[in-house]
Design a protein with these regions (language model features):
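Basic/aromatic-rich interaction segments and small domains that mediate binding to polyanionic partners
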Residues: 3-47, 66-68, 72-103
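Charged, non-catalytic accessory extensions
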Residues: 52, 367-392, 398, 419-518, ...
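SF2 helicase/translocase NTPase motor core
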Residues: 100-114, 119-124, 136-151, 156, ...
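N-terminal pre-P-loop "Q-motif" helix
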Residues: 150-170, 494-498
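Walker A/P-loop
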Residues: 169-189
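SF2 helicase motor core recognition
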Residues: 259, 316-317, 530-533, 574-588, ...
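A short beta-strand element within the Helicase C-terminal
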Residues: 320-323, 583-595, 620-623
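A conserved SF2-helicase RecA2
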Residues: 601-607, 612-688
Length: 982
């Protein structure tokens, strides 16, 4: 390794795409290199730096930073820096200091290796060419980033992921109902943004109980390696910022929100995307905001992208929902009163969309649409739709375009995506089983006194230190709180008849029993869950793991795993309210609500633990209550007032806000309760009608546009069934030294051989490897099988090593053919386009590295169009390395001339390649920019920063494409030989 000096030019051996680097600084141990073309700075160990000093010799062509070219005659060195002397393209003698070399210059490593006799195996060359071909094809594919994850192809999830991941620094609220896959949507968005280089780092904040679930999901479904950060790990890094130790950081909200110092460190780290799960817990009001909200607000002001996840966006009321929208776009959502006014107009838009179906021929429908359509393009479409003389195809086209325009230009649908079960469809039936039990004397004694004595409630609240109405609807908690009462000598679970009922059902193998099924039990309080489990153990000998917020993450995961185990696992899992939030228990169909929560959204979250995408059975909801108790009255309000157990309706927050206080006062009075139930039912029906006509209707229509979703799915299926993938993987595994064994049923086992190249994901020498399949359905049915795709880490690693390294960039082979005399030479040169640009531009979607193949015979005749790559490769034979070196040495000058001529031949193709890339870019981005600008005139949810970013991106892409150059990627020398082997 040469000595380093500031100003010298070096190139990375393993990352040639970085362009020409400049030494910024160095000392005895390290050197810092700036790669200006790709906006990257790297620091290397001086003793092991994978760098090559750039030194040109006589005859080499160089490019200056000012754009003029020169052929080098000689070079001079002074104080470690080189100055080149030669003639420019006009014949003028000029000097060029190395500091003035163009940052975008490329270096023909293949040329240097070939002329020095370094040749690789012929099958390596073949694999390299095929890798470049497939990489070029896949990088431009519309399903890139969505086809690899281990997921079912569910339309609404894929539509949202595709729509959001196309945006610059997306900031959205993912608000699908419980069980519709918000975590998968967020994972898809994250995966795609990482894969296409739009983002490099992400911070994921989730409730403590969900950290391991997120960790496992991101690894198992998306092959994303995430660092779980906690206080212990943070302290292990000493004074260093722990948030800068990984690309993807997962942290507990409980930990971060309670630690101001760690919050400052997170804010100081340069993340590109922030994901916040269970965002309804971010407390805010017009008077004050909670610590959790303030933390996320500060982080989101520094991090460009933001995904907020919540199944209950309005659980804390409309103001709290507005606050979350304010996090997404503070400029757009700054006035709560104005926001409420906008909400009033969504019904008109939804009505106009429905009216489209009644045209032509309905004058009232025309008026309804006219009221909300005011731009010239939409009016022209409306005229076509209303014209009875237009044909059916014209009507349908105009109707579809108008529907898209109305959805785009109105409402919060651009920043909030909310799908409902009603809109998605295909969910199992919910069955409510009401169980009436006799109230235990200890509970009845308190309830009867409350019914007789109004003042006793105040005494009870003081004595028990409980809130109202908790003291009424959770009798076991009240019993525990009154433990000083001499009558309360037995444990509550010993006198509570719900325990006896549970034990009977758990041992009953009849139709009404649970003996052959898994049962999830949810209670509101942690102490209730703990006592319930103890009662099952002592009274029935049943071991039931408990899942509550007081457990450590490991203890919680252990309890969930014990319940999920089909063979040796527990039949029952007991959960507290908070402890079970966000968990997925869809393998279970029986849910016992030991008590009921106060808020309808919490009730829906309970049911959502089982009622999820993938649930194959009807959901059996068992609610034991005591006759004449406040709990029974609460059940009636839920069931009779709002059909809360039959399906999610999305209006529970409104109903609770309207009747919550009155309901609490009516839990001891049937007459008052009956009035509240009737009023609730009336408002419930009205709210459902408003939903169908207003904002929720718009959100549902906008959250999944079927035609676009189907197009995404078809693109994914195209890659799923790509016949080239298995062939490519088979060749690559063989060359990288991975043994593959067919196990049957479309499954193979991959195992490292002793000769395997190190560092392949999931494969370590001496270990067993893993089983894999190309079939999506088979991979989903078996957790122990990985799914191989073009996006699998193993595939990407092998392709990356080939394209970024020297593997297969030179080769020499023999061609024996009766029609060709022996001793002749051909050179097969493969050039590829190269354009140093920031990864965040995602240039590859328009102009990926593109192969230009040139085949020349020894006279310089271009045979590219006459002899295909495949046809030639099938007729070649290998040559041992010593003979190959001798042949190259003997034809050295001839090869140099062919390399020069081949470059000229390839350069003729470059303008058309750049033009095609520019055209693809303009077709997509010009249309998208025009669409956003048109939307901004009607929909304030379109951010100015988004339009500006897209405009700058378009210009940056155009500038980058203009700097595209060709470089020699690989070369194969072909020598003809006697077909008879003489």
């Amino acid at each position: 390794m040469s000595d380093f000096s500031p100003g010298q030019r070096w190139i990375s051996d393993g990352e040639a795409e970085l362009g020409l680097g400049t030494v910024l600084s160095n000392d005895f141990r390290s050197v810092t290199i700036l790669f200006s073309a790709s906006q990257e700075t790297r620091t290397y160990n001086t003793r092991q730096a994978p760098l090559t000093r750039v030194m040109f010799g006589s005859g080499d062509r160089v490019l200056s930073a000012d754009g003029w070219k020169m052929i080098v005659d000689e070079s001079r060195e002074s104080r470690g820096l080189i100055t080149y002397v030669g003639e420019d393209e006009h014949g003028n003698l000029r000097e060029l200091p190395e500091a003035k070399l163009a940052d975008t210059m490329q270096f023909d490593q293949a040329r240097d290796r070939l002329l020095t006799g370094q040749v690789d195996r012929n099958d390596w060359f073949d694999l390299r060419f095929r890798t470049l071909h497939h990489f070029q094809r896949i990088e431009r594919h519309p399903a890139l980033g969505l086809s690899g994850p281990r997921i079912d192809l569910i339309p609404h999830q894929l539509y949202i992921a595709d729509e959001v991941s196309r945006r610059h620094a997306p900031r959205v609220l993912l608000a699908d109902e419980v069980g519709l896959g918000k975590t998968i949507e967020a994972g898809l968005i994250l995966h795609r943004l990482l894969l296409n280089g739009r983002i490099e780092r992400a911070l994921i904040l989730v409730p403590d109980s969900l950290t391991h679930q997120w960790l496992v999901e991101l690894l198992r479904r998306f092959s994303l390696d995430v660092r779980l950060l906690n206080e212990t790990q943070s302290q292990a890094h000493g004074l260093a910022n722990p948030f800068e130790t990984a690309q993807l950081v997962l942290a507990s909200q409980n930990w971060l929100f309670a630690n101001p110092h760690r919050q400052e460190q997170a804010e100081a780290s340069q993340f590109d995307l922030l994901i916040v799960d269970e965002a309804h817990h971010l407390a805010w009001s017009e008077e004050e905001s909670g610590a959790s909200y303030q933390c996320v607000e500060r982080l989101s002001s520094k991090i460009p992208g933001l995904l907020l996840l919540t199944a209950t966006p309005e659980q804390m009321g409309l103001a709290s929902h507005f606050a979350r929208l304010r996090l997404l776009d503070p400029e757009r959502y700054h006035d709560f009163e104005r926001f409420k006014e906008e909400e009033q107009h969504y019904g008109e838009v939804a009505g106009a969309i429905d009216a489209l179906e009644r045209l032509p021929g309905d004058a009232e429908a025309r008026e309804a649409i006219d009221a909300v359509v005011d731009d010239r393009d939409s009016q022209a479409l409306l005229a076509t739709l209303a014209n009875p003389e237009a044909d059916a195809a014209q009507h349908e086209s105009a109707r579809g375009q108008l529907r898209e325009a109305l959805l785009d230009r109105h409402g919060t649908g651009r920043v909030m995506f909310r799908n409902s079960r009603r809109h998605v469809g295909g969910f199992p039936e919910r069955r409510l089983h009401r169980v009436s039990l006799e109230m235990p004397p200890a509970y009845r004694r308190v309830v009867r006194r409350l019914e007789r004595d109004e003042d006793y409630l105040d005494e009870l609240l003081i004595e028990s230190e409980m809130d109202h109405p908790d003291v009424l609807i959770y009798p076991d908690a009240m019993y525990r709180a009154l433990s000083n009462d001499p009558l309360n000598v037995e444990p509550w679970w010993h006198i509570d008849r719900r325990i006896n009922w549970l034990l009977e059902r758990l041992s009953d193998d009849g139709e009404e029993g649970f003996a052959n099924d898994k049962v999830l039990i949810i209670a509101h309080h942690r102490d209730t869950a703990l006592g319930l489990a103890e009662g099952l153990r002592v009274l029935g000998g049943i071991h039931a793991p408990v899942f509550h917020e007081g457990l450590s993450l490991i203890e919680r995961d252990r309890a969930a795993a014990a319940f999920a185990d089909e063979e040796d696992g527990s039949q029952v899992l007991v959960c507290s309210e908070i402890g079970s939030e966000g968990r997925n228990f869809q393998f279970c169909r029986h849910l016992v609500m030991f008590d009921l929560p106060q808020h309808p959204d919490q009730l829906e979250q309970r049911i959502g633990r089982l009622d999820r995408i993938g649930q194959k059975h009807a959901i059996e909801l068992h609610v034991p209550t005591f006759v004449g108790s406040p709990g029974e009255r609460l059940l009636r309000w839920y069931h009779e007032g709002m059909d809360a157990f039959s399906a999610p309706h999305g209006v529970g927050s409104d109903l609770f806000e309207a009747f919550g206080d009155a309901l609490a006062d009516a839990l001891l009075d049937d007459d008052s309760l009956n009035e509240i139930i009737a009023e609730t039912r009336t408002l419930f029906s009205a709210r459902l009608a408003e939903q169908d006509a207003g904002r929720n209707r718009l959100l549902e229509l906008n959250a999944c546009r079927p035609a676009k979703a189907e197009a995404v799915i078809e693109a994914i299926r195209e890659l799923d069934h790509d016949p080239a993938l298995p062939r490519y993987i088979e060749r690559a595994l063989d060359i990288f030294g991975v043994d593959s064994q067919e196990l049957g049923a479309g499954i193979m086992h991959l195992q490292p051989s002793p000769q395997m190249l190190d560092g392949l994901p999931g494969l370590v020498k001496g270990e067993e490897g893993f089983s894999a399949t190309f079939d999506r359905a088979r991979a989903l049915s078996r957790d122990d099988i990985q799914r191989l795709s073009w996006e699998h880490p193993l595939t990407r690693e092998m392709m990356g090593r080939i394209l970024d390294g020297t593997m297969g960039n030179t080769a020499l082979a023999l061609l024996r053919h009766p029609a060709i005399s022996s001793g002749r030479l051909m050179a097969e040169l493969v050039f590829r386009t190269h354009c140093p640009a920031p990864r965040s531009l995602h240039l590859n979607r328009f102009l990926p590295p593109t192969a230009v193949r040139v085949l020349l015979d020894e006279s310089g005749a271009n045979l590219t169009g006459k002899i295909s790559f495949t046809g030639l490769s099938q007729n070649l034979q290998k040559v041992n390395k010593s003979m190959a070196r001798d042949l190259i040495k003997s034809r050295h000058d001839q090869l140099r001339e062919l390399l020069t001529q081949g470059e000229s031949e390839a350069e003729r193709e470059l303008p058309s390649i750049i033009e095609a890339g520019e055209k693809r870019m303009r077709e997509q981005l010009d249309g998208e920019l025009a669409r956003l600008q048109a939307l901004a005139e009607h929909n304030p949810a379109v951010r100015d920063v988004e339009i500006d970013a897209l405009s700058r991106e378009r210009q940056a892409l155009s500038d980058a494409m203009e700097s595209t150059r060709l470089r020699l990627d690989s070369v194969r020398v072909i020598i003809t030989a006697d077909p008879k082997g003489r």
